């Protein structure tokens, strides 16, 4: 298989004046080469498409990418990693005799050779395939999508990025002397993606990412705590970190969670009434339920055979939407050139539709939803979520809390995992007791678990208020930046199981 991951990479273990000079010079070289775009990529893709069709392929899809990627890690004010690289290459998918062949290559001039390799792989795979792959018909689009940004991450000096990270580190340490360690990670990407298919689509879209992530530890006597925070945008440039995800905002958010855990009362284990806040209900929507509605996974999930059936309490709706303006998971087209859309996974308690790509839309007999995504040209597009959420209800905050003698309000999570049978376990990094219908003391060492498909029937109320989105990354053999969320949702006593120290 043809693969070319990096054209240029630099990594450093510390930040010194000499190192900075080398990084700055290399960065200018990378920027110049990226901006110049010496190769007319669409012309090359056109010729390769024609070649693939002459070979006899049923369908040919080429996804070319050219971009600049940067990653920096700082551990307690010391830069321990700095990587910059150009990523330029083409993903080739060929359908022949009812089977896929996939090749990725950085050899742009030798694209025909890679197309032929993908074609031969498809022909070989077809020999043992029981059922031929067929694609749902898709309209062809010719479009150029522009990014409207104020500060291209490529144009921001290294010194300014390191100052941002230093300011964030200092903000966190200054919050409380019990903060013991701070790691800050920054990742940016900027470039273009070109999609060309034998069906006639010719689409150019931007590649854009700014991402900031601190991980913070604290200690008070023998008590330890840790918390994380994540901010990202795929529609704004560095101005997102200048004006929204500032060091002051992020620093206060994550430091507060660490200290609340140090001061919190130990959580009780068992089953209690509870309210899950937007970030926690969002991770359930994505991890414990959303993956079940990805059409390539549904057959082995708890949603198998449930289309058209009641799967939740009255009034519960859950969607995945790739069209929400400025959200992390939003794009105009997916990586097959299909327009993104709003997918009503659960509508008024009924499982209504699945997320699809062209292959599985045909296989399960549902519409194209625009959920085919690939991490980069090194990967084939697969069905991925975008912005996954529970829809708002009609209850006020007072209504949700009323009548809870003792329970928990879970505000933010540290991490979690789920299985295809809908079982889940999530670590909570910010939570409070609910006592006599009022918010009480912060708690520590709390986790939640359950079977999400059972928990859906234990929902007793859904807030009518707007909610913040949680941005994150999802792994499914490859990485995708996503958003998740939902309003405050109340669960009955046996809807969620709590793990704690007492």
What does each of the following model-derived ranges do?
Residues 4-5, 10-17, 22-502:
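N-terminal small-residue-enriched
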